[in-house]
Amino acid sequence: MLPDSVRQWQAGGRMLSTAAGSVFVRSKPGTGPAVLLLHGFPSSSYDYRDVTQRLGDRAWLTLDFLGFGLSDKPRPHRYSLLEQADIVAAVVADVAPGPVVLLAHDMGTSVATELLARDIAGTLPFELQRAVLTNGSVIIERASLRRSQKILRGPFGPILARLTNERGFVRGFAELFSAQHPLTDDEARAQWALMARDDGQRILHLLCAYLNERVRFAARWHGAVRDWGKPLGFLWATGDPVATTNVLAGLRELRPAAEVIELPGIGHYPQIEVPDEFTAGARRLLQI
């Protein structure tokens, strides 16, 4: 059963049918350009609930990627960030056909770099004006992947997915938060409920395939960070044990002129830990 906070978030959105399956979408009309919020692995758009409350009269939209949160979780299925980018394009076309600015976290940063690559190639079907990447292992060789991530992407991934339970998930998820802002019981329950909806924990090994795509498409996605001709900033929580400051250093090497805002000592989920500071940083970088 979904906790009340999740059901409230769900009640404010709707399901949108795409070529790949139905995805949960939540949006708010307002002044533009609309803010497009992309979440990470293994969570959902629920991560941004406190951020959206701090966007004032700004239009925004977000979604749960296919396989995540309140969206369909097909199996068997070959999950791909290229498909997720297609889904994002379909959602934008349906919800906010005007110009957008982009804020992406974790796995969502690689979906974002695919969108940047398409924009460079002239194949992106919407106008993307600015983008901000936050705590995502875009340069995977510089990241400190968790042991569970390494197992999930390997031959024993299906076994680990079958064995995943709430206790183990919460223990690992808590390690992503800083000591100053530890994972709360309510947050843990909500995150597990969203992931485990429709037995989503059983497909974690399928969802984790995005890590291999970060290797396969490194030249394309790193090149997009380097070459995209519009403003791109980095908003980084420096206490992240996975997407560490080593990743940020690599991004700075790719794009030395990028504006960077650091959130000292904060963990992997700054939008949950410090929504005020996170939203303020995002608004500054996106100039909204």
Model features per residue range: what roles?
Residues 27-70:
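Conserved HGGG/HGGXW glycine-rich cap/lid loop of the alpha/beta-hydrolase fold
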Residues 104, 108, 112:
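Gly/Ala-rich beta-loop-alpha elbow adjacent to hydrolase catalytic centers
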Residues 200-253, 262:
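Conserved serine/cysteine hydrolase catalytic core
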Residues 266-279:
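Catalytic histidine-centered segment of alpha/beta-hydrolase-like enzymes
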Residues 117, 124-160:
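Flexible "cap/lid" loop of the alpha/beta hydrolase fold
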Residues 16-19, 61, 65-103, 117, ...:
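Active-site loop/oxyanion-hole signature of alpha/beta-hydrolase fold enzymes
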Residues 1-35, 56-59, 92-99, 123, ...:
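Alpha/beta-hydrolase fold catalytic core
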Residues 142, 163-226:
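Conserved alpha/beta-hydrolase catalytic His-Asp/Glu region
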